[in-house]
Amino acid sequence: MMKEPTYSLHENHAMSIPVAQSGKTRIGWIGTGVMGRWMCQHAMSKGFTATVYNRSADKLQPLLDLGAKAATSPKGVAEQSDIVFAIVGFPSDVRHVFLGADGALAGSKPGTVLVDMTTSEPSLAKEIYEAAKAKGVASLDAPVSGGDVGAKNAALSIMIGGDKDVVAAVQPVFEAMGKTIIHQGGAGAGQHTKMVNQILISSNMIAVCEGLLYGYKAGLDLETVFKSVSVGAAGSKALEVLGPRMLARNFEPGFYVEHFIKDMGIALAEAEKMNLSLPGLGLAKQLYEAVRAQGYGRKGTHALLMALETLNGIKR
Protein backbone atom coordinates (compact mmCIF):
# COMPACT_ATOMS: atom_id res chain seq x y z
CA MET A 1 0.00 0.00 0.00
CA MET A 2 1.30 3.46 -0.93
CA LYS A 3 2.15 5.57 2.08
CA GLU A 4 0.06 8.70 2.49
CA PRO A 5 2.19 11.82 1.79
CA THR A 6 2.75 14.08 4.77
CA TYR A 7 4.45 17.36 5.47
CA SER A 8 6.10 18.45 8.71
CA LEU A 9 4.13 21.02 10.66
CA HIS A 10 7.06 23.33 11.30
CA GLU A 11 10.79 23.07 11.12
CA ASN A 12 12.20 21.24 14.14
CA HIS A 13 8.75 19.84 14.91
CA ALA A 14 8.08 16.11 14.79
CA MET A 15 4.40 16.38 13.89
CA SER A 16 3.31 16.00 10.27
CA ILE A 17 0.23 17.03 8.30
CA PRO A 18 -1.33 14.70 5.72
CA VAL A 19 -1.91 16.16 2.29
CA ALA A 20 -5.63 16.92 2.02
CA GLN A 21 -7.55 14.06 0.44
CA SER A 22 -11.04 14.05 -1.04
CA GLY A 23 -13.37 11.87 1.00
CA LYS A 24 -11.01 11.79 3.95
CA THR A 25 -9.96 15.29 5.01
CA ARG A 26 -12.60 17.21 6.95
CA ILE A 27 -12.78 20.92 6.27
CA GLY A 28 -14.38 23.64 8.34
CA TRP A 29 -15.68 26.89 6.93
CA ILE A 30 -16.33 30.13 8.82
CA GLY A 31 -18.07 32.90 6.86
CA THR A 32 -20.50 31.90 4.10
CA GLY A 33 -21.31 35.25 2.51
CA VAL A 34 -20.83 36.53 -1.04
CA MET A 35 -17.48 34.75 -1.41
CA GLY A 36 -17.31 32.05 1.24
CA ARG A 37 -20.47 30.23 0.24
CA TRP A 38 -19.11 29.49 -3.24
CA MET A 39 -15.59 28.70 -2.10
CA CYS A 40 -16.84 26.14 0.40
CA GLN A 41 -19.29 24.73 -2.12
CA HIS A 42 -16.50 24.10 -4.63
CA ALA A 43 -14.45 22.30 -1.98
CA MET A 44 -17.46 20.15 -1.11
CA SER A 45 -17.99 19.37 -4.80
CA LYS A 46 -14.51 17.80 -4.80
CA GLY A 47 -15.50 15.43 -2.00
CA PHE A 48 -14.37 17.30 1.11
CA THR A 49 -16.90 17.04 3.94
CA ALA A 50 -17.62 20.37 5.62
CA THR A 51 -18.69 21.78 8.98
CA VAL A 52 -19.80 25.39 8.62
CA TYR A 53 -20.51 28.45 10.74
CA ASN A 54 -21.82 31.91 9.93
CA ARG A 55 -22.92 34.71 12.22
CA SER A 56 -26.17 34.95 10.21
CA ALA A 57 -27.26 31.32 10.27
CA ASP A 58 -29.67 31.68 7.33
CA LYS A 59 -26.68 32.04 4.98
CA LEU A 60 -25.66 28.47 5.79
CA GLN A 61 -28.70 26.91 4.15
CA PRO A 62 -27.33 26.44 0.59
CA LEU A 63 -24.39 24.50 2.05
CA LEU A 64 -26.53 22.54 4.49
CA ASP A 65 -28.69 21.51 1.54
CA LEU A 66 -25.54 20.05 -0.04
CA GLY A 67 -24.70 18.01 3.06
CA ALA A 68 -22.62 20.34 5.23
CA LYS A 69 -23.04 20.20 9.01
CA ALA A 70 -23.69 23.37 11.02
CA ALA A 71 -21.68 24.35 14.08
CA THR A 72 -22.69 26.95 16.65
CA SER A 73 -19.27 28.62 16.95
CA PRO A 74 -15.85 28.81 15.28
CA LYS A 75 -14.56 26.59 18.08
CA GLY A 76 -17.22 24.02 17.19
CA VAL A 77 -16.11 24.12 13.56
CA ALA A 78 -12.49 23.42 14.50
CA GLU A 79 -13.44 20.53 16.79
CA GLN A 80 -14.90 18.73 13.76
CA SER A 81 -12.27 19.68 11.17
CA ASP A 82 -8.74 18.96 9.98
CA ILE A 83 -8.42 22.23 8.03
CA VAL A 84 -10.40 25.32 9.03
CA PHE A 85 -10.96 28.12 6.51
CA ALA A 86 -12.40 31.54 7.28
CA ILE A 87 -13.35 34.50 5.13
CA VAL A 88 -15.01 37.23 7.19
CA GLY A 89 -15.24 41.01 7.07
CA PHE A 90 -12.77 42.92 9.20
CA PRO A 91 -9.58 42.27 11.20
CA SER A 92 -11.65 42.41 14.40
CA ASP A 93 -13.75 39.54 13.00
CA VAL A 94 -10.60 37.61 12.10
CA ARG A 95 -9.26 38.02 15.62
CA HIS A 96 -12.57 36.86 17.10
CA VAL A 97 -13.05 33.77 14.92
CA PHE A 98 -9.46 32.56 15.31
CA LEU A 99 -8.17 33.82 18.66
CA GLY A 100 -11.35 34.45 20.67
CA ALA A 101 -12.37 32.32 23.65
CA ASP A 102 -14.83 30.56 21.34
CA GLY A 103 -12.53 30.79 18.33
CA ALA A 104 -11.13 28.18 16.00
CA LEU A 105 -7.76 27.92 17.74
CA ALA A 106 -9.48 27.06 21.01
CA GLY A 107 -11.11 24.07 19.29
CA SER A 108 -8.05 22.93 17.35
CA LYS A 109 -6.03 19.86 18.20
CA PRO A 110 -2.33 19.54 17.30
CA GLY A 111 -1.97 19.08 13.54
CA THR A 112 -5.01 21.17 12.62
CA VAL A 113 -4.46 23.80 9.92
CA LEU A 114 -6.07 27.26 10.17
CA VAL A 115 -6.43 29.22 6.91
CA ASP A 116 -7.52 32.86 6.94
CA MET A 117 -8.75 33.92 3.50
CA THR A 118 -9.99 37.32 4.66
CA THR A 119 -8.11 40.40 3.50
CA SER A 120 -6.64 41.45 6.82
CA GLU A 121 -3.59 42.89 8.57
CA PRO A 122 -0.19 41.25 7.93
CA SER A 123 0.68 41.74 11.61
CA LEU A 124 -2.45 39.84 12.65
CA ALA A 125 -1.54 37.00 10.30
CA LYS A 126 1.82 36.74 12.07
CA GLU A 127 0.12 36.85 15.48
CA ILE A 128 -2.23 34.00 14.54
CA TYR A 129 0.73 32.04 13.15
CA GLU A 130 2.67 32.32 16.41
CA ALA A 131 -0.36 31.56 18.61
CA ALA A 132 -1.16 28.50 16.51
CA LYS A 133 2.44 27.29 16.48
CA ALA A 134 2.50 27.37 20.29
CA LYS A 135 -0.34 24.80 20.26
CA GLY A 136 1.14 22.58 17.55
CA VAL A 137 -1.34 24.01 15.04
CA ALA A 138 -0.45 25.34 11.58
CA SER A 139 -1.63 28.62 10.11
CA LEU A 140 -1.75 30.21 6.66
CA ASP A 141 -2.88 33.64 5.48
CA ALA A 142 -4.41 33.17 2.04
CA PRO A 143 -6.43 36.19 0.86
CA VAL A 144 -8.02 36.02 -2.57
CA SER A 145 -8.76 38.21 -5.56
CA GLY A 146 -11.44 37.75 -8.18
CA GLY A 147 -14.61 38.87 -6.43
CA ASP A 148 -17.92 37.07 -6.57
CA VAL A 149 -17.41 36.02 -10.19
CA GLY A 150 -14.07 34.41 -9.39
CA ALA A 151 -15.58 32.69 -6.36
CA LYS A 152 -18.54 31.33 -8.34
CA ASN A 153 -16.31 30.10 -11.16
CA ALA A 154 -13.58 28.63 -8.91
CA ALA A 155 -11.19 31.01 -10.65
CA LEU A 156 -9.76 32.97 -7.73
CA SER A 157 -6.18 34.13 -7.35
CA ILE A 158 -5.00 32.89 -3.94
CA MET A 159 -2.00 34.63 -2.35
CA ILE A 160 -0.50 32.56 0.46
CA GLY A 161 1.75 33.32 3.40
CA GLY A 162 3.06 30.66 5.76
CA ASP A 163 5.21 27.55 5.80
CA LYS A 164 5.80 25.94 2.42
CA ASP A 165 5.09 22.44 3.70
CA VAL A 166 1.69 23.48 5.07
CA VAL A 167 0.79 25.14 1.76
CA ALA A 168 1.55 21.85 0.00
CA ALA A 169 -0.69 19.96 2.43
CA VAL A 170 -3.66 22.29 1.80
CA GLN A 171 -3.02 22.61 -1.96
CA PRO A 172 -5.75 20.15 -3.08
CA VAL A 173 -8.41 22.25 -1.35
CA PHE A 174 -7.01 25.49 -2.74
CA GLU A 175 -7.20 23.95 -6.21
CA ALA A 176 -10.94 23.40 -5.75
CA MET A 177 -11.57 27.14 -5.46
CA GLY A 178 -8.83 28.92 -7.40
CA LYS A 179 -6.83 28.91 -10.61
CA THR A 180 -3.79 30.94 -9.56
CA ILE A 181 -2.35 29.62 -6.30
CA ILE A 182 1.00 31.11 -5.32
CA HIS A 183 3.01 30.84 -2.12
CA GLN A 184 4.38 34.34 -1.50
CA GLY A 185 6.56 33.69 1.56
CA GLY A 186 6.30 33.46 5.33
CA ALA A 187 3.41 34.42 7.59
CA GLY A 188 1.93 37.76 6.52
CA ALA A 189 3.29 37.60 2.96
CA GLY A 190 -0.11 36.66 1.57
CA GLN A 191 -1.68 39.71 3.18
CA HIS A 192 1.11 42.02 1.97
CA THR A 193 0.57 40.69 -1.56
CA LYS A 194 -3.15 41.38 -1.28
CA MET A 195 -2.33 44.95 -0.28
CA VAL A 196 -0.41 45.31 -3.56
CA ASN A 197 -3.51 43.99 -5.32
CA GLN A 198 -5.82 46.48 -3.61
CA ILE A 199 -3.51 49.42 -4.27
CA LEU A 200 -3.53 48.54 -7.97
CA ILE A 201 -7.32 48.28 -7.99
CA SER A 202 -7.92 51.54 -6.13
CA SER A 203 -6.58 53.93 -8.75
CA ASN A 204 -7.81 51.73 -11.60
CA MET A 205 -11.39 51.98 -10.31
CA ILE A 206 -11.17 55.78 -10.30
CA ALA A 207 -9.98 55.70 -13.92
CA VAL A 208 -12.74 53.32 -15.05
CA CYS A 209 -15.49 55.39 -13.44
CA GLU A 210 -14.11 58.73 -14.64
CA GLY A 211 -13.65 57.41 -18.18
CA LEU A 212 -17.23 56.16 -18.42
CA LEU A 213 -18.53 59.36 -16.86
CA TYR A 214 -16.62 61.41 -19.43
CA GLY A 215 -18.11 59.34 -22.25
CA TYR A 216 -21.61 59.84 -20.88
CA LYS A 217 -21.15 63.60 -20.56
CA ALA A 218 -19.77 63.76 -24.11
CA GLY A 219 -22.99 62.18 -25.37
CA LEU A 220 -21.41 58.95 -26.57
CA ASP A 221 -23.06 55.53 -26.69
CA LEU A 222 -21.28 53.89 -23.76
CA GLU A 223 -21.95 50.36 -25.00
CA THR A 224 -20.11 51.22 -28.22
CA VAL A 225 -17.35 53.04 -26.35
CA PHE A 226 -16.87 49.99 -24.13
CA LYS A 227 -16.33 47.72 -27.15
CA SER A 228 -13.41 49.89 -28.27
CA VAL A 229 -11.64 50.73 -25.03
CA SER A 230 -12.01 47.40 -23.22
CA VAL A 231 -9.75 45.61 -25.71
CA GLY A 232 -7.07 48.28 -26.12
CA ALA A 233 -4.31 49.53 -23.86
CA ALA A 234 -6.92 50.83 -21.40
CA GLY A 235 -8.40 47.38 -20.88
CA SER A 236 -8.34 45.97 -17.35
CA LYS A 237 -10.03 43.33 -15.25
CA ALA A 238 -12.00 46.05 -13.47
CA LEU A 239 -13.29 47.40 -16.79
CA GLU A 240 -13.98 43.92 -18.16
CA VAL A 241 -15.93 42.68 -15.13
CA LEU A 242 -17.45 45.82 -13.63
CA GLY A 243 -17.86 47.98 -16.75
CA PRO A 244 -20.93 46.07 -17.98
CA ARG A 245 -22.47 46.24 -14.51
CA MET A 246 -22.02 50.02 -14.44
CA LEU A 247 -23.58 50.35 -17.89
CA ALA A 248 -26.54 48.28 -16.67
CA ARG A 249 -26.75 50.39 -13.47
CA ASN A 250 -26.29 47.23 -11.44
CA PHE A 251 -24.34 48.16 -8.32
CA GLU A 252 -24.93 45.01 -6.30
CA PRO A 253 -21.76 43.84 -4.58
CA GLY A 254 -19.14 41.50 -5.86
CA PHE A 255 -17.02 43.16 -3.19
CA TYR A 256 -18.39 45.64 -0.66
CA VAL A 257 -17.37 49.31 -0.61
CA GLU A 258 -17.00 49.15 3.19
CA HIS A 259 -14.59 46.23 2.93
CA PHE A 260 -12.56 48.01 0.26
CA ILE A 261 -12.22 51.04 2.53
CA LYS A 262 -10.95 48.69 5.24
CA ASP A 263 -8.38 47.24 2.85
CA MET A 264 -7.12 50.65 1.76
CA GLY A 265 -6.83 51.68 5.41
CA ILE A 266 -4.67 48.63 6.13
CA ALA A 267 -2.47 49.36 3.11
CA LEU A 268 -2.01 53.00 4.14
CA ALA A 269 -1.13 51.98 7.70
CA GLU A 270 1.42 49.45 6.44
CA ALA A 271 2.86 52.04 4.05
CA GLU A 272 3.27 54.49 6.93
CA LYS A 273 5.25 51.88 8.86
CA MET A 274 7.58 51.68 5.85
CA ASN A 275 7.81 55.50 5.50
CA LEU A 276 6.20 55.09 2.09
CA SER A 277 4.03 57.82 0.56
CA LEU A 278 1.12 56.58 -1.60
CA PRO A 279 -0.88 59.68 -2.57
CA GLY A 280 -3.00 57.89 -5.17
CA LEU A 281 -4.16 55.37 -2.60
CA GLY A 282 -4.94 58.17 -0.15
CA LEU A 283 -7.12 59.91 -2.75
CA ALA A 284 -8.93 56.68 -3.58
CA LYS A 285 -9.72 56.04 0.08
CA GLN A 286 -11.13 59.57 0.47
CA LEU A 287 -13.35 59.11 -2.58
CA TYR A 288 -14.62 55.76 -1.31
CA GLU A 289 -15.36 57.28 2.08
CA ALA A 290 -17.59 59.72 0.18
CA VAL A 291 -19.29 56.74 -1.48
CA ARG A 292 -19.99 55.26 1.95
CA ALA A 293 -21.22 58.61 3.28
CA GLN A 294 -23.76 58.71 0.46
CA GLY A 295 -25.21 55.42 1.71
CA TYR A 296 -23.49 52.98 -0.63
CA GLY A 297 -21.24 51.16 1.83
CA ARG A 298 -22.94 47.81 1.14
CA LYS A 299 -22.85 48.26 -2.63
CA GLY A 300 -20.08 47.04 -4.92
CA THR A 301 -16.85 48.96 -5.41
CA HIS A 302 -18.10 50.19 -8.79
CA ALA A 303 -20.67 52.30 -6.90
CA LEU A 304 -17.91 54.91 -7.00
CA LEU A 305 -19.54 55.91 -10.28
CA MET A 306 -22.66 57.09 -8.44
CA ALA A 307 -20.62 59.21 -6.04
CA LEU A 308 -18.80 60.87 -8.94
CA GLU A 309 -22.14 61.51 -10.63
CA THR A 310 -23.38 63.24 -7.48
CA LEU A 311 -20.16 65.26 -7.29
CA ASN A 312 -20.81 66.48 -10.83
CA GLY A 313 -24.54 67.10 -10.38
CA ILE A 314 -25.46 64.31 -12.79
CA LYS A 315 -28.80 62.59 -12.13
CA ARG A 316 -29.46 59.30 -13.92
Where are the model-predicted features located?
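NAD(P)-dependent dehydrogenase/reductase Rossmann-like domain
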Residues: 13-18, 289, 293-316
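NAD(P)+-binding Rossmann beta1-loop-alpha1 motif at the extreme N-terminus of oxidoreductases
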Residues: 3, 7-86, 112, 117-118, ...
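Active-site-proximal catalytic alpha-helix in oxidoreductases
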Residues: 154, 158-161, 175, 182, ...
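Rossmann-fold dinucleotide-binding core
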Residues: 119-202
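Rossmann-fold NAD(P) dinucleotide-binding segment
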Residues: 74-86, 90-137
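Hydrophobic beta-strand scaffold residues
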Residues: 50, 70, 139-140, 181, ...
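Interdomain hinge/lid region at the active-site interface
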Residues: 187, 191, 235-302
